Amino acid sequence: MIIPWQGLAPDTLDNLIESFVLREGTDYGEHERSFEQKVADVKRQLQSGEAVLVWSELHETVNIMPKKQFRE
């Protein structure tokens, strides 16, 4: 289920994004990006609609994923 990120308190959203960035081992290519840059990238992707905030009933967890990968 997609969670509308706009309805979350700013601190809650920031904490979810930071948690996501910390557990993702994404390779950013030749130039490593700072934690702050990664957080800003994820926030931008949520704002643009490229990424969505998702609740998994099966795992009882919240995750962030590319919108094109989300299946209801």
Curated annotation (Swiss-Prot):
Please state what the protein is called: UPF0270 protein YheU
- Disulfide cross-links: none
Q: Spell out the coiled coil positions from the record.
A: none
Organism superkingdom: Bacteria
The family classification in the record reads:
Belongs to the UPF0270 family.
